[in-house]
Regions:
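Rossmann-like S-adenosyl-L-methionine
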Residues: 4-115
Length: 115
């Protein structure tokens, strides 16, 4: 996925973005060590959602916005509640029916720092 993201950025003249693909728990810890503070963090965890360590690292990175892509409404609700307690509010929720004629739905949530 990151290869397509990078190509899309080049095609659109975007030079101030870095794309990192990998396990969020590992990547967030590495970014913290490098003292990286992204403007936007995009997470697309497995069905089990984000673990506590990953949420801790994500919040410590202090992004202005978090885009959370989820295939499980229950873990999405759980993680959004935790992120809300940690200073992020839900701005937009968009369900995406990627699998018509099934009960499965992807949901994209935009969260922003609460001021």
């Amino acid at each position: 996925m990151c290869i397509r993201d990078r190509r899309n950025a080049v095609r659109n003249g975007i030079a101030n973005a870095e794309f990192i693909c990998g396990d969020a728990g590992v990547c967030t810890a590495q970014l913290l060590e490098r003292r990286i503070q992204p403007d936007v963090a995009i997470v697309d965890p497995p069905r089990k959602g984000l673990d506590g360590t990953t949420i801790d690292s994500l919040v410590k990175m202090n992004p202005e916005r978090i885009v959370y892509v989820s295939c499980d409404p229950a873990t999405l609700a759980r993680d959004c509640a935790v992120l809300n307690e940690r200073g992020y509010g839900v701005e937009v929720v968009q369900p995406v029916d990627m699998f018509p004629q099934t009960t499965h739905v992807e949901t994209v949530v935009l969260m922003s720092k609460v001021r």
